[in-house]
Design a protein with these regions (language model features):
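Alpha/propeptide regions of enzymes that mature by internal proteolysis
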Residues: 1-263
């Protein structure tokens, strides 16, 4: 039996003043895990807390694209191989719920209007997301990784994208191996400059490194030094098959928090 744990972040560059907001999401996940809930449930519900918090660029706090539109991405992957992701959704305060709904479906990815039609058919809330200009201290993604008593690991990520990008742009969040990666024994989530994360296949490479060397922090340091373009601001969170989760960033700030159950 594994010891439940969770780690979450509020985005690269978000600033330490948002740490308490991240800690609230971690507390929700911890409560679910302590009561015997699954890693998927814990990761999704904690991600919903972050999506519902307007200080983050995800869900209700998502920023405008260059044309004034508000387009939301989200993803989830589980260590048993299941995944779901959605791209460029409108009128969806909690896109992570749509992504999670795909975990047990034949398809695992949806985009745009088709994603919203699917969500309508599944009874997932449809409501306007008004959007906002970016804050001075940018934040582009939220993410949660949870491990339950069975040893299952799940990673949930969500974003409103970058405010200086066009409406058709796809960042790292919904791309497997880039903004997220989970396999047996490890889960990784990334945040920051999506193009750099994508070109570096960052989350997959960090996960492979962790499984190879067995050290979360050392693997993150290696990735930030060796897998990215110069000056790309990026943060990473990771959780292994045992022990606590960890977070690390080369940006000025990345609020992150972790929890592990008592033995």
């Amino acid at each position: 039996m594994s010891i439940p744990a969770v780690v979450a972040h509020g985005g690269a560059g978000a600033g330490p003043e948002r740490l308490a907001n991240v800690e609230r999401a971690v507390a929700i996940a911890a409560g679910i895990l302590e009561s015997g809930g699954s890693a998927v449930e814990a990761a999704v519900e904690a991600c919903v807390v972050l999506e519902d918090d307007s200080v983050f660029n995800a869900g209700t706090g998502s920023v405008f694209r260059t044309d004034g539109s508000v387009l939301l991405d989200a993803s989830i992957q589980v260590s048993d191989g299941r995944m779901g992701f959605v791209i460029a959704m409108e009128d969806t305060p909690n896109p992570i719920r749509v992504a999670a709904n795909l975990l047990d479906e034949e398809i695992n990815g949806l985009t745009g209007e088709g994603a919203r039609i699917w969500a309508d058919a599944k009874g997932i809330e449809k409501a306007p997301v008004e959007g906002r200009p970016p804050f001075k201290e940018a934040t582009d993604t939220v993410g949660v990784i949870a491990r339950d008593r069975s040893g299952s690991i799940a990673c949930a990520t969500s974003t409103g994208g970058c405010s200086d990008r066009p409406p058709g742009r796809v960042g790292d969040v919904p791309l497997p191996g880039c903004g997220f990666w989970v396999q047996d024994g490890v889960g990784v989530g990334a945040t920051g400059i999506g193009e750099a994360i994508t070109r570096g296949m960052l989350s997959f490479r960090v996960a492979e490194r962790i499984l190879d060397v067995g050290d979360l922090e050392a693997s993150m340091i290696w990735a930030l030094e060796e897998c990215l373009e110069d000056d790309a601001e990026v943060g990473i969170i990771a959780l292994g098959s045992e022990g606590t989760g960890h977070g690390l960033a080369n940006s000025k700030n990345m609020p992150w928090s972790s929890w592990i159950a008592r033995k």
